[in-house]
């Protein structure tokens, strides 16, 4: 019998970034009959608007909290060097596109490294396209696919699936056995 462990995340979720070392340990110790499936959560819809100063301060404070509580480090230059947007759907779409080429984990890692360590903005198309190229995806095809109705539909389907799991916080883990779903408490 195959079990499914759903990992519900957003590639631009700072708590998901902090959870990465724990998730990697979980994957090492999982039985071979448990398949891990990533589901993007979609924290924030497409937007070109600059994030309000209040929201910027709130998110940067979350980064400080994570540094203090968990020890994960962030490059706070992001808040000085970038024009932050409250928009993660583009990063979610990039993750799905990378999945189609078996590069999902590389894309998640590239997005998180760019955002949290290199102070780059994954809500900008130029950044996302350069990350696709960096992990070996065809730049032109990726850019074209990023604009397609198919990726928009695929993202909406994944967000609807996430909602059907009643997940409202990221990261989340849910184990599926037969038709039953079992939420798993997250520990860092």
Please give the residue ranges for each predicted region.
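Structural alpha/beta surface segment adjacent to cysteine/selenocysteine redox centers
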Residues: 20-118
């Amino acid at each position: 019998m195959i079990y499914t462990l759903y990992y519900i995340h957003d590639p631009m979720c700072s708590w998901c970034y902090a959870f990465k070392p724990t998730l990697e340990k979980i994957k090492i110790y999982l039985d071979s009959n448990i398949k891990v499936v990533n589901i993007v959560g979609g924290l924030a819809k497409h937007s070109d608007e600059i994030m309000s100063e209040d929201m910027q301060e709130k998110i940067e404070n979350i980064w400080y909290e994570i540094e203090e509580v968990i020890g994960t480090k962030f490059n706070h230059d992001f808040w000085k060097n970038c024009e932050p947007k409250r928009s993660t759907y583009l990063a979610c779409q990039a993750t799905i596109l990378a999945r189609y080429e078996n590069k999902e984990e590389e894309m998640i890692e590239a997005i998180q490294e760019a955002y949290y360590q290199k102070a780059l903005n994954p809500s900008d198309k130029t950044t996302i396209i350069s990350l696709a190229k960096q992990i070996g995806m065809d730049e032109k095809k990726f850019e074209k696919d990023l604009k397609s109705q198919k990726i928009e539909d695929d993202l909406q389907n994944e967000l609807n699936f996430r909602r059907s799991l009643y997940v409202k916080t990221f990261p989340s883990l849910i184990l599926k056995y037969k038709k039953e779903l079992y939420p798993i408490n997250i520990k860092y």
